[in-house]
Amino acid sequence: MAIKQLSETLINQIAAGEVIERPASAAKELIENALDAGATRIEIATAGGGKTLLRVTDNGIGMSPADLELAIRRHCTSKLNDSLADIRTLGFRGEALPSIGSVARLSITTRTAEAREGAAITVTGGRSEPARPSAAIVGTVVEVRDLFFATPARLKFMKSEKAEAAAISEVVRRMAIAFPRVRFVLSGSDRTTLEFPATGDDRLARMAQVLGRDFRDNAIEIDAEREGARLTGFAGVPTFNRGNSLQQYAFVNGRPVQDKLIMSALRAAYAETIPQGRYPIAVLSITLDPALVDVNVHPAKSDVRFRDPGLIRGLIIGAIREALTREGDRAATTGAHGLMRAFRPEFHRAGQQRPQEPWSAAASPHRPLRFEEAARGFAEAPQAAFSDFAQPSARSAAAAVEATRATDGQAASFPLGAARAQLHENYIVAQTDDGLVIVDQHAAHERLVFETMRTALHARPVPAQALLIPEIVGLPEDDCDRLMAHAEEFTRLGLAIERFGPAAVAVRETPAMLGEMDAAGLVRQLADELAEWDTASGLAGRLEYLAATMACHGSVRSGRRLRTEEMNALLRQMEATPGSGQCNHGRPTYIELKLADIERLFGRS
């Protein structure tokens, strides 16, 4: 069969198969065009889940009649010159409008501020008409009807109207988070479904609009910079988590992305504080030189490729962990909300059950302890003032000890208050200036012990055990090169490796804390991490996991009766210890109830 040139319509339909997968894809492309045009108000109207109608109206700069005729032609754009190395707009390929026009009934009406009248053009199944004069306001209205009517096979793969409408809503939410200065309105067949007024530079106010007030109340601000890359945004406290990753948003130079590297780094940052199967809520925005990121790696521009992925991964993990440490004594405010609901009289009517807390009350089961002997002695140690545990520094230790000597009235002014009682030999009730705090003594002390052990790991070289017979691990030569480049770092963590020929390394020492272990498996894991991310966290992660296991085993147990001075000492050390708001499994260590909440329970005004 002879080779022939495909028709322009068929070429556009092929492109549409990659660029326009569903109505939400078309909505994304049209909203991006509106934002690139400088719009401050964008209205999206849909019918039939976007399959019957999708209309995007903006107040951007509009187009001239000549530009309008070019806009519907493939690879015609005002956003790109001669290089892909410096892309500063959301769109740049010039594919969206011709792709949509090839599979739908497309009409565009537009006007610039300088023009007395607007212009309109229509494209039906790839066939266009000349631009014609039309009444129009400044800006652009793009109307898409009967999406995929020209490719009926694609319609068979569409989901229900409800599912397609939900996908469009998610696109609008992502765009609204990225552009707080823009007003977004989404309407369905008969009503407005989403409306986000512009919030200017107040990004947290926009987060509250999109993600709810609970996120605003439980968000930690992120702002860090490293080697020209800046990370900003908000991340939820560890105890404010979900059962899925739907509320994790990432942006690169304002572009919404679903990048595996960013999401992997987010998971790694929370690995020590959230139970397995739970997900943090976060909004992360990375700003860097456009020349350092390639946005042209996916038809939908949802993935990007960084020139230095290790830098970005390290920036995300470091910034989030620093923020969690800074705000580590915070627990989710939604815990108190759940407690308030449980006390409401109407809540206990027949057929109703108690609400499930936003954190995982039934966290993932503890993995089997491997080194009981290593943790022996923690539980038996004298705990009169808990002075042997969990002081992150000498200054905070002295402050905690001094705080235990405070008078009863003075103690109530501390953030976690003064201990008043112990319930069921497991929960400490403390009075604060404006309410009360209930502390899980085992979860709290577990965190204090873990922080002490982790500080010890980071403060000096980890003790190592020599292998009687070095273990030889065969690896590709480039993996060996990467491992040896980090050999000094591994030695500080107790893992001593040497080069053994061009395609192998010899393991001579392993961390003593890990006991008998699969040294070859660990080395291969480290090699894989270095190959993918240019950083190796597996060894440090194993050591910290063991420290968490030992801390759980060695903490003051549930069922142990504590004296008042012991309870107050625990409260003061929690205040002085980073990350004390949640235990090592991500559960909260305390819940706070304000006096106003308590008075409402008793009907007081």
From Swiss-Prot:
GO BP: mismatch repair
Pfam families attached to this UniProt entry: DNA_mis_repair, HATPase_c_3, MutL_C
Coiled coil: none
InterPro entries: DNA_mismatch_repair_CS, DNA_mismatch_repair_MutL, DNA_mismatch_S5_2-like, HATPase_C_sf, MutL/Mlh/PMS, MutL/Mlh/Pms-like, MutL_C, MutL_C_dimsub
UniProt keywords, alphabetically: DNA damage, DNA repair
Domain of life: Bacteria
GO molecular function: ATP binding; ATP hydrolysis activity; ATP-dependent DNA damage sensor activity; mismatched DNA binding
A cellular component term, taken from the record's GO annotations: mismatch repair complex
Protein role: This protein is involved in the repair of mismatches in DNA. It is required for dam-dependent methyl-directed DNA mismatch repair. May act as a 'molecular matchmaker', a protein that promotes the formation of a stable complex between two or more DNA-binding proteins in an ATP-dependent manner without itself being part of a final effector complex.
Entries under PANTHER family matching the protein: DNA MISMATCH REPAIR PROTEIN MLH, PMS, MUTL, DNA MISMATCH REPAIR PROTEIN MLH1
Family: Belongs to the DNA mismatch repair MutL/HexB family.
Name used for this protein in its record: DNA mismatch repair protein MutL
Lineage of the organism: Bacteria, Pseudomonadati, Pseudomonadota, Alphaproteobacteria, Hyphomicrobiales
Gene responsible for this protein: mutL
